[in-house]
Amino acid sequence: MAKRSLSALNSDALRGKRVLVRVDFNVPLNDAGAITDDTRIRAALPTIKDLTGKGAKVILSAHFGRPKGQVNEDMRLTPVAARLSELLGAPVAKTDSCIGSDAEAKVAAMADGDVVLLENVRFFAEEEKNESGFAEKLAALAEVYVNDAFGAAHRAHASTEGVTKYLSPSVAGYLMEKELQYLQGAVDDPKRPLAAIVGGSKVSSKIGVLEALIDKCDKVLIGGGMIFTFYKARGLSVGKSLVEEDKLELAKELEAKAKAKGVQLLLPTDVVLADNFAPDANSQVASIDAIPEGWMGLDIGPDSIKVFQDALGDCKTVIWNGPMGVFEFDKFAAGTNAIATTLAELSAKGCCTIIGGGDSVAAVEKAGLAAQMSHISTGGGASLELLEGKVLPGVAALDEAA
């Protein structure tokens, strides 16, 4: 169901209004407490600037880290407020707490177009419990609600779901709208052929998404450590490679399901092996039916890359979630880099390429190809759940589009 978006609210509906905006500012910090990647802060700028430009009083709500419901001085949003202020070229006040007298006073002092960042909502255990009294206090600071935190949309928390019971309108921000447009669109109404590339080390973490994608895709390409569970299920020797013994039957079922549905399910034909799990390990390429004892697979091989590239060549929509190998080790990054390059080339030819959160995003950024993809999702778990066809509580709680 389409959700009402910020784009539907004009200046008259927003000028002078206090607008609570849930953002995803869960950014990485180094040991010195400096932000090492401000992508998530930048991703919220279109929504924030639109609101300030329309004369709204913008009250930002965010979580940072896992403080477990208590104040943790290392998880305050102070560096985030400073960076946001630099990006906006305007002051950003930060409250000492997300509710209470300091937050109320700073909000009361706001002029039209001002921005205030509320302190980490997860300093209160009530946030993750979606406790109604806490949600009501948070909502009492504002008159309008905008959710732009797609990365937290799969959680029914007070700041993502609870506050919508007390604020109307409750709408999607521009980042949320874009995420839903691409990810929901890829699942519900894609240009075909539709392919999914699923990687990562474990089948167990991708069961739901694999089952859903086999239902919806024309082709499913599997890479990463999970391939060895499929090979072992076929009766092949996998050496020291990672295998989930309790998922062998499931691997067989997934292959059978794809076959029954006429979906092309492709596994690598060769792998790059290592004698131990290290960046400087000895390596060799072997066919999947000739993996020697004592060796482990850490990447897809050169023949597999060609097979995957050929399979993707005619696709009009491609979703990628999870790397092809241990791309953190340069020696075992060729498969992941080749897929990133292939998708960049497909994008240039008009294919819709969607990077579905998590490690694939890091891989595309490491390859310097992020700008060439159609859409890079900011959500890890949220992206997976949406691709699985699950309802995201933070999305469901928003107003329906007129």
Swiss-Prot record:
Binding-site residues for ATP, renumbered to this chain: K206, G297, E328, G357, G358, D359, S360
InterPro entries: Phosphoglycerate_kinase, Phosphoglycerate_kinase_CS, Phosphoglycerate_kinase_N, Phosphoglycerate_kinase_sf
UniProt pathway: Carbohydrate degradation; glycolysis; pyruvate from D-glyceraldehyde 3-phosphate: step 2/5
Major localization listed first in the record, in broad terms: cytoplasm
Family matches, as Gene3D superfamilies: Phosphoglycerate kinase, N-terminal domain
Localisation per UniProt entry: Cytoplasm
GO terms of biological process kind: gluconeogenesis; glycolytic process
Keywords, alphabetical: ATP-binding, Cytoplasm, Glycolysis, Kinase, Nucleotide-binding, Transferase
Catalytic activity line of the entry: (2R)-3-phosphoglycerate + ATP = (2R)-3-phospho-glyceroyl phosphate + ADP
EC number: 2.7.2.3
Annotated residues for binding of substrate: D24, F25, N26, R40, H63, F64, G65, R66, R122, R155
Domain of life from the UniProt record: Bacteria
GO annotation, cellular component aspect: cytosol
Top enzyme category: transferase
One annotated GO molecular function: phosphoglycerate kinase activity
Secretion signal span: none
HAMAP family: Phosphoglyc_kinase
Family: Belongs to the phosphoglycerate kinase family.
Oligomeric form and interacting partners: Monomer.
Official protein name in the record: Phosphoglycerate kinase
Gene this protein is translated from: pgk
